[in-house]
């Protein structure tokens, strides 16, 4: 049976709304929503080639990362992958903390005994912390749509670190500097300029004023030595 994309999109929307929103208990355990098929599926994160299934994958908010799926059809009938989804689970409780957007894709059909692969991009906007990422594939099989859940991957979501050379940060710094410079200029014109001009007027000498002249004063001769007085009298006599 061939499913159209609008039909698949309607099914995915109904599945997410019914399975996870209407039934709070469904968010604690998704095993009851999955169907056992002879269909092996695995995935990797290409930009993290050294991260294995038991390792911690680090991804960043605001950035897209790619999930590369690989699968093998071990059933005796054709299987078609028609949609992708998944969820981020709590590390301790297993409860779903955020769903990946369930999206229809152009059908990827795998005949019995054959393998295939495809990639899907995921964008993030989550609270920075550690999760268990569990991708899901929506499968068209035996005239029905079923859900196949992949393995979990420990994933730490982080905010993008801010660099001092980030263009947006540099622009913000330039705006702040220009703002402070403008405020300083205004403050100088309002208060500083008047203050410095007033100080200069106080210290400026008056025009035409004569410079101070040293004047002689009479000195009491009682404290002068007697020899010094005799010398002065002798000079006068001469």
Curated annotation (Swiss-Prot):
Residues 191-238 are cytoplasmic. It comes from Meyerozyma guilliermondii (strain ATCC 6260 / CBS 566 / DSM 6381 / JCM 1539 / NBRC 10279 / NRRL Y-324) (Yeast). Is probably involved in a pathway contributing to genomic integrity. This is Increased recombination centers protein 22. Belongs to the IRC22 family. The gene is IRC22. PANTHER family: TRANSLOCON-ASSOCIATED PROTEIN SUBUNIT ALPHA, TRANSLOCON-ASSOCIATED PROTEIN, ALPHA SUBUNIT. Residues 1-21 form the signal peptide. Keywords: Endoplasmic reticulum, Membrane, Signal, Transmembrane, Transmembrane helix. Its main location: endoplasmic reticulum. One of its GO terms (cellular component) is endoplasmic reticulum membrane. Residues 22-169 are lumenal. The lineage of its organism: Eukaryota, Fungi, Dikarya, Ascomycota, Saccharomycotina. It is found in: Endoplasmic reticulum membrane. The chain crosses the membrane at residues 170-190. InterPro entries: TRAP_alpha. Pfam families: TRAP_alpha. It is a single-pass type I membrane protein. The keyword Secreted does not apply. The keyword rRNA processing does not apply.
């Amino acid at each position: 049976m061939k499913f159209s994309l609008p039909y698949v999109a309607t099914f995915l929307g109904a599945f997410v709304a019914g399975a996870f929103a209407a039934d709070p208990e469904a968010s604690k355990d998704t095993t009851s929503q999955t169907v056992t098929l002879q269909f092996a599926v695995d995935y990797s994160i290409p930009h993290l080639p050294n991260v294995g299934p038991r390792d911690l994958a680090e991804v960043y908010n605001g950035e897209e990362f790619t999930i590369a799926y690989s699968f093998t059809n071990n059933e005796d009938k054709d299987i078609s992958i028609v949609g992708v989804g998944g969820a981020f689970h709590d590390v301790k409780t297993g409860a779903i903390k955020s769903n990946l957007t369930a999206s229809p894709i152009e059908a990827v059909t795998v005949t019995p005994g054959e393998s295939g692969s495809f990639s899907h991009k995921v964008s993030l906007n989550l609270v920075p912390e550690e999760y268990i990422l569990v991708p899901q594939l929506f499968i068209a099989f035996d005239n029905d749509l079923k859900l196949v859940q992949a393995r979990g991957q420990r994933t730490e979501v982080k905010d993008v670190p801010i660099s001092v050379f980030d263009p947006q940060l540099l622009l913000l710094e330039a705006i702040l500097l220009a703002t402070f410079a403008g405020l300083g200029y205004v403050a100088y014109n309002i208060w500083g300029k008047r203050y410095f001009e007033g100080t200069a007027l106080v210290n400026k000498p008056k025009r035409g004023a004569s410079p101070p002249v040293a004047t002689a004063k009479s000195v009491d001769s009682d404290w002068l030595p007697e020899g010094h007085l005799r010398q002065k009298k002798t000079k006068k006599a001469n």
